[in-house]
């Protein structure tokens, strides 16, 4: 793999992972355009590293929340050991519970992960999925904004958002787009919908990386390419952080319409180019 390819894929991963335009779909398109599909597909180990790069971006952007949850996790263990029940439950502890429940639907989908991976080779599916993502974003802009935060959101709310995240395993369906849209439909405050979507991505990305790392070990890791891979990781982390900041700004304005139009254009273009090819 060349440095240029690593930079391009890192940039695509960092931007598309957090903006609601589907990183899996755009990576598949980029791989197709760069002619590195099929037998010479992007190495699993590089895929793992790219996702770790975007995970660094989430930690950098939401470190205060993550730190509070880590502290509250150990405080909660102490409360259990001493049979204490805080009333009310601290917001950070509620957030931990919401994230755990929101992650559960992914476990149901684990047996089908190879099926979803194969869908990434189908440009017709990806083009259609991008159009669907655009529709979801367009509709989410027209949903009445709720007021729920971690203090008032229910476990059922978190489960519904988690189902949206599980559906986004389909390449071309944006994970952030699905989770933010699901959050808006369940009555989340727009800023909290975005924050919860990113925090919910942490166990999802870690879990996916564990499974992909196993595949990488089975197929063999080319350690001589690691320096090139690390270039892509840095690009993914930096562009990912910038994307998070941009999406938070857009959330403050309450408009995702531009992303919807982009997804429609990208989806139609993908379908047209695939047909012509």
Residue ranges of model-derived segments:
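Multi-pass membrane proteins that catalyze or facilitate reactions on polyprenyl-/lipid-phosphate substrates
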Residues: 1-277
């Amino acid at each position: 793999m060349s440095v240029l390819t690593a930079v391009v894929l890192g940039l695509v991963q960092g931007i598309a992972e957090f903006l609601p335009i589907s990183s899996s779909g755009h990576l598949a398109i980029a791989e197709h355009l760069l002619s590195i599909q099929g037998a010479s597909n992007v190495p699993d180990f590089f895929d793992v590293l790219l996702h770790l790069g975007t995970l660094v971006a989430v930690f950098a952007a939401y470190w205060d929340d993550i730190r509070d949850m880590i502290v509250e996790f150990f405080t909660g263990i102490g409360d259990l050991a001493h049979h204490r029940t805080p009333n009310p439950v601290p917001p950070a502890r509620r957030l931990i519970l919401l994230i755990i429940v929101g992650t559960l639907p992914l476990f149901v989908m684990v047996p089908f992960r190879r099926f979803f991976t194969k869908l990434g080779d189908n440009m017709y599916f990806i083009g259609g999925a991008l159009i669907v993502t655009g529709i979801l974003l367009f509709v989410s802009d027209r949903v009445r904004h709720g007021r729920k935060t971690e203090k008032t959101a229910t476990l059922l709310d978190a489960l519904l958002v988690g189902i949206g995240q599980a559906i986004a395993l389909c390449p071309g369906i944006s994970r952030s787009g699905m989770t933010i849209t699901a959050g808006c439909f369940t009555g989340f405050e727009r800023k909290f919908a975005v924050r919860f979507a990113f925090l919910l991505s942490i166990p999802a990305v870690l879990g996916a990386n564990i499974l992909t790392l196993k595949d990488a070990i089975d197929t063999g890791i080319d350690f001589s390419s690691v320096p090139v891979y690390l270039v892509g990781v840095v690009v993914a982390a930096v562009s990912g952080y910038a994307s998070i900041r941009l999406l938070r700004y857009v959330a403050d304005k309450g408009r995702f319409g531009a992303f919807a139009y982009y997804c429609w254009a990208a989806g139609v273009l993908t379908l047209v180019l695939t047909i012509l090819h």
